[in-house]
Structure formats: C-alpha cells, structure tokens
Amino acid sequence: MSRVTLSRYLIEQTRSNNTPADLRFLIEVVARACKEISHAVSKGALGGVLGSMGTENVQGEVQKKLDVLSNEILLEANEWGGHLAGMASEEMDNAYQIPGKYPKGAYLLVFDPLDGSSNIDINAPVGTIFSVLRCPNEYLSQNEALDEKAFLQPGTQQVAAGYAIYGPQTMLVLTLGHGVKGFTLDREMGSFVLTHEDITIPESTQEFAINMSNQRHWEAPVQRYVSELLAGEEGPLKKNYNMRWVAAMVADVHRILTRGGLFMYPRDSREPSKPGKLRLMYEANPMSFLVEQAGGASTDGHQRILDIKPEGLHQRVAVFLGSKEEVARATAYHKE
C-alpha cells in the first residue's frame, strides 16, 4: 500500500471536506518552511546557530539565533505565495504586512517560530506552532493596510492549526477541523508522510506536566489540585500520577496528544497583572484547537480558551489542557 504524503492528504481533504485550494497550498508552504527549520536545528553548532542574539523580543525574552532564523524562514516562505493577507509572530512587535509587490490572499498566519528555544543549547526538543485564520473582508483590498485588529479573533475562528516538533524525528501535527493527523518527515523522500491517523486523547489520565519550581507562586486552586495529584492513591483522587516537564509547550503537548495527560501553565503571584505566561494567539489557541479536535479540553481555569476574544496580539493566558476529566477537575476548583 502506498504511503500517504501530506500533499496527498491535503488533496483528499479538498475533495472530501471542501478544503479550499488556497488553504491547502498555504499548509504545504508552512510545512516546507518547517522542514527548513528542522534542517537548521539539526545542524546545531555545526551551523553556527546556537547561542543568543543579544536582543529581546516584544515579550522581553532574550532571542536565540534560531528564534530569529526560524522567524525569517517562515516570513520569506509565506510572503510571496498569494495565500496570505498578513502574518503575526511571537518574535515581532507588530503584524507583518505582505509586500506590495506580491498578491494578497484570504488568510492570516500566526506563529511561534521556535517554541522552547531555551532547549536549543541542550539538544532537547523544540518546535514551531502555527494557526490560520480567515482575514476579515475589509482588509482584503490591496490598498488597505493590515492592522492588529484583523488578527483579534477568538480561537473558534481558526480554520487550521498545527505544530512541527524537532526531536529524534521531525513530525508535523495538523488539524483542519476534522480531527488530528500526524505526519513524520521522511528525510530520504523529503516529504511528510502520514503516520498517525485520528490522534485521540484519553478522557482520563495519570500523567501531568507543570513547572513545579513555581509552586510557591500559584493560586490556591492550583495548589490544591496539584497537591491532590501528588497525594496519589492515598489522596482524594485515589490513583498515582507521574509528572513530566520538558520546558517546551510543543513537546509536552505532543506527549499528551500521543498518550494522554494534562498540561498546566497557571497564572502566578509574581506578575498579578498578567493572566498567565503563554501567548493566547501563538500558543494557547492553536494547541487548544488541536487538543479539542483530539477529544480533549482546554481552559484558562475559568473558561474555554477558544472562546476568549483577544485584546492584543501578544495577550497572555493561563492554560490547562489535555484529558477532559482532569481539565474539568482543575477548572471546577477555580470556580469554587
């Protein structure tokens, strides 16, 4: 039986689910950019891409060389194809305008070019996260400048989302709103090949991911919930849990999509004015779309993440996502 490449899968989606051709082409371009980023990541010190740039992004985070390179790869790959009206990146202050010499398309691309970049220098998994939205009609004119407001749509408006994870294998995990598929990069073929069909998250789990070093800063509902997880069989939840933490959302969520679990990045008392650390547009929305399509759930502790109306490109949010049973429990504790 012949293997199903990403291109073939997207063509079949065009036939069976009326996926627009422009969206298919856009996903293929993003996938090609991810292959290029994967190649750069795999070269490591041999490619001269390790270390920091000595600059900070809009988040106040020190930019790694690969952060900047990955951002440039995604911009250059996608700006000329005629599929996009604009782009927004975690590494850039403002929305990216499609140069006037190129045609505009009907979609907006939002991305974190290299999630978990603190892992680069220790050779641990990193990844690229992306989200696709439809551009509002008023911005589709060639003469209309694109501004931030075009992107400020709730996660329910996403038409596609996914991530590439650069680990022992490079994988692309994708949803077009009809379930979640996983594609592994065959380096000999140069193609992403469908290897994981109908990825599904179990409703219950015995695994969770959280940065325990921040425990003293958590709010009371999170303190209570995690203490119950750690209490194991002797505690109120009556079962033992294992904790995992890779310090890259893309890696932790990939594990949860693969075998179940709960990912938590709650707000804490160090910056009470901020509702969380992770970015709604670049990280929480695309990952929540994937998790829900795989049968899981995602909230900020109070409401469904995909229902949140963004107020800014770089808005932050608390995140609880993964197996439905545990997400529901953590959310219920916040409401008591």
From Swiss-Prot:
Annotated residues for binding of Mg(2+) 1: E90, D112, L114
Keyword flag Magnesium: yes
Pathway this chain belongs to: Carbohydrate biosynthesis; gluconeogenesis
Catalytic activity: beta-D-fructose 1,6-bisphosphate + H2O = beta-D-fructose 6-phosphate + phosphate
Localization (cell): Cytoplasm
Cofactor(s) this protein requires: Mg(2+)
EC number: 3.1.3.11
Cofactor stoichiometry and binding remark: Binds 2 magnesium ions per subunit.
Keywords: Carbohydrate metabolism, Cytoplasm, Hydrolase, Magnesium, Metal-binding
GO MF entries: fructose 1,6-bisphosphate 1-phosphatase activity; magnesium ion binding
InterPro entries given in the database record: FBPase_C_dom, FBPase_class-1, FBPase_N, FBPtase
An example Gene Ontology CC term for this record: cytosol
Source species, domain of life: Bacteria
Binding site for Mg(2+) 2: D112, D115, E283
Binding residue positions for substrate: D115, G116, S117, S118, N211, K277
EC class: hydrolase
Transmembrane segments annotated in the record for this chain: none
GO terms (BP aspect): fructose 1,6-bisphosphate metabolic process; fructose 6-phosphate metabolic process; fructose metabolic process; gluconeogenesis; sucrose biosynthetic process
A Pfam family of this chain: FBPase
Subunit structure: Homotetramer.
Family: Belongs to the FBPase class 1 family.
Protein name listed in UniProt: Fructose-1,6-bisphosphatase class 1
Lineage, uppermost ranks: Bacteria, Pseudomonadati, Pseudomonadota, Gammaproteobacteria, Pseudomonadales
Protein encoded by which gene: fbp
